Structure formats: structure tokens, C-alpha cells
């Protein structure tokens, strides 16, 4: 696959880190590195599974609460079925190839990463990484419903590295589009030359 690679060559990436998160402070300030979960194809990745017997009304609160998880849940089902050799989003470190991609992500997702620090990092040792258009995640998180066929299409497009710009998408009867923002999922270890947690 063109968007999947394994290497032991040192490579630079960029990552947003939360200086107020205790785990980030421990990993970055004391150890100077982040490590993904180990790649174990046999272990289940989903912590919570939807109730197959659930049939009652969903409140707006519940809908907002589970929307992000359901996006990850559906992507993980697709990965397990058709892209099992790819890094799992629930185990990987989320990175960016270029500063340009980080700026685009920050502009679109300021509420998510606005208070975080942007750091350059380097891979150490053997690692597996894949590149994907994170705009598919944005589409999955829009407040609309999707049938199983659409969910499968979006999942396959995301995992294969396809860009949203190559498709005409609709949400609630209206055209939906975003510029692509390429994210990297990495299984392995990254080190930081700059361990500082202040700007």
C-alpha cells in the first residue's frame, strides 16, 4: 500500500503535546519520548462495544457524547476487516509530516490543539506508519446519520489513504467538503530534542 511504510531510518515528524496533561509531562519532561502501544494483531483494540439490543430514543446529550467514539469504532471495524496490518488509531501516536499540515490542523481544530505545544520529534528504532486524510474523521463526526454502506465507504477511503477532495460528499442533503489534512499514525517510539513544556 502506498500510504503504509515500515522503517528503522530516523525520520522527523511534528506533534501537538498538551503541557498540562500528567502523562505528557511524565513522558516528555522525564523520559524525553513517547511510545505507542505495542503492535499486537491478536488483541482487541476497542474498550467499549455498542449494545446490540439498544433500540430506544437517543437524546441530544447522548448523541454528542458518543459521536466521536462511534467514528473511531466504525473506523476500527473497517481496519480489522480490511486493513489489519495498518496501525490502529486507538494505539498509534498521531503525527504530521510537515509544519504546513500542522498549521492547517490548528486552524480547523483550534479547540482541540489550541492550548498545546507543537514539537518536532524523531523516530527511534523500528516503526510502522501510515498516512491518512483526517478530513474523513471530520466527516464522520458531523451531526448526521450514515447508513452502513456510507460508513464502509468512508472507512475504506480513510484507510487506503484516499483524499476527501477526490469525492463529492453530502451531509443532510447539502454538499460537504474540506481541504485535506494529512495525518500520520505511527506505531513505535519518538524522541524529543526539546523537552521543554513552555512556549
PLM regions and their residue ranges:
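Short glycine-enriched loop/turn motifs at secondary-structure junctions
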Residues: 84-90
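Active-site-proximal specificity loops/subdomain of glycosyltransferases
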Residues: 62-84
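Conserved NAD+-utilizing ADP-ribose enzyme module
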Residues: 2-12, 18-65, 91, 100-112, ...
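Intrinsically disordered, charged low-complexity linkers and terminal tails
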Residues: 1, 71-73, 88
Amino acid at each position: 500500500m502506498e500510504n503504509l511504510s515500515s522503517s528503522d531510518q530516523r525520520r522527523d515528524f511534528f506533534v501537538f503535546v498538551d503541557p498540562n496533561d500528567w502523562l505528557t509531562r511524565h513522558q516528555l519532561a522525564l523520559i524525553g519520548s513517547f511510545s505507542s502501544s505495542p503492535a499486537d494483531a491478536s488483541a482487541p483494540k476497542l474498550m467499549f462495544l455498542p449494545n446490540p439490543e439498544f433500540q430506544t430514543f437517543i437524546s441530544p446529550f447522548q448523541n454528542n457524547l458518543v459521536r466521536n467514539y462511534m467514528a473511531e469504532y466504525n473506523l476500527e471495524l473497517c481496519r480489522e476487516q480490511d486493513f489489519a496490518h495498518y496501525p490502529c488509531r486507538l494505539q498509534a501516536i498521531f503525527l504530521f509530516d510537515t509544519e504546513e499540515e500542522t498549521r492547517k490542523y490548528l486552524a480547523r481544530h483550534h479547540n482541540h490543539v489550541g492550548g498545546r505545544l507543537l514539537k518536532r520529534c524523531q523516530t527511534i528504532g523500528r516503526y510502522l506508519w501510515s498516512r491518512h486524510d483526517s478530513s474523513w474523521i471530520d466527516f464522520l463526526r458531523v451531526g448526521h446519520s450514515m447508513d452502513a454502506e456510507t460508513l464502509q465507504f468512508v472507512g475504506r477511503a480513510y484507510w487506503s489513504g484516499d483524499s476527501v477532495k477526490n469525492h463529492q460528499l453530502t451531509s443532510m442533503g447539502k454538499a460537504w467538503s474540506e481541504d485535506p489534512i494529512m495525518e500520520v499514525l505511527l506505531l513505535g517510539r519518538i524522541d524529543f530534542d526539546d523537552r521543554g513544556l513552555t512556549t
